[in-house]
């Protein structure tokens, strides 16, 4: 006679198999993708160490009036909830699809005025060319990473 616990374990094992199958990574064909060459000029470690990369939560995102490219992000950087960063990625993303996501930003850049708005950092994106068209992916991480988490 099988114990009730044995039935539960067997059930969990059979349920885990389909779940594991769903997690198989989708294979992407990168044969038509071109990337920029890596910089040959080296950056010394002290200069790199001044770059402060942080996880940021996207609290709000909106198109910048009179700009076809710029999106205005209001971000939680773990210290204050009003860091504003502008990014020229509107061609690739609609504002509403980014709210609530966790992105990566460099927060140690001096403010830069763009379209009358001070941008207080830079969001990190990956850029490539595919079949003659530029592609861009905003670097987003697991939403379980808290705002302000430092990247090393």
Give the positions of each predicted feature.
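Phosphate-backbone binding interfaces of nucleic-acid-interacting proteins
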Residues: 1-152
